[in-house]
Amino acid sequence: MNFLAHLHLAHLAESSLSGNLLADFVRGNPEESFPPDVVAGIHMHRRIDVLTDNLPEVREAREWFRNETRRVAPITLDVMWDHFLSRHWSQLSPDFPLQEFTCYAREQVMTILPDSPPRFINLNNYLWSERWLVRYRDMDFIQSVLNGMASRRPRLDALRDSWYDLDAHYDALETRFWQFYPRMMEQASRKAL
């Protein structure tokens, strides 16, 4: 899962959106640095990552990547799940339009920005103003996201080529998304994530 899915599942679970978004920027035990609700959100994010990586649908999808891109498949798939969530948002969350949800999420996250790591602050400078969560629905933007990550982290250069794996297996990936994401939504609503 990437930014949109973590925020969405956090909302459904009535968990801290701030903590769920911040989690990838926090190493080790967050309890000394953040308030309890944010810490709970960080822990939820980490549980979701482990759960998602071990889903049979996701493990199967990783196998569809070529040898040269399989190492970055987990990252590529996380971004792709956000694509499908953004694309099908009106079906999955009909009572909370994506643009409104994005504004709501931004308001929640802004409350912790002053005490956040610099890399997280930098992300927020772009995430909201460039409307990433809404733009995830466009595959051209997904390609741009993957290229951007590859540019910032040379060891992840294979992300550029992983675009072709997404394109080649688009329909099958979408099917897998529909197989697991509604289950995760239900688990989040029961606070079981």
From Swiss-Prot:
GO biological process: any one? fatty acid biosynthetic process
User: What does the record give as EC number?
Assistant: 3.1.4.14
Keyword terms, alphabetized:
Fatty acid biosynthesis, Fatty acid metabolism, Hydrolase, Lipid biosynthesis, Lipid metabolism
Catalytic activities: holo-[ACP] + H2O = apo-[ACP] + (R)-4'-phosphopantetheine + H(+)
One of the entry's Gene Ontology molecular-function terms is: [acyl-carrier-protein] phosphodiesterase activity
Q: What top-level branch of life does the organism fall under?
A: Bacteria
Top EC category: hydrolase
Which family does the UniProt entry place this protein in?
A: Belongs to the AcpH family.
Output the PANTHER family linked to this UniProt entry: ACYL CARRIER PROTEIN PHOSPHODIESTERASE
Q: Which HAMAP family match?
A: AcpH
Summarize the protein's role.
Answer: Converts holo-ACP to apo-ACP by hydrolytic cleavage of the phosphopantetheine prosthetic group from ACP.
* Protein name according to UniProt: Acyl carrier protein phosphodiesterase
| Species in which this protein is naturally found | Escherichia coli O6:K15:H31 (strain 536 / UPEC)
**Encoded by which gene?**
acpH
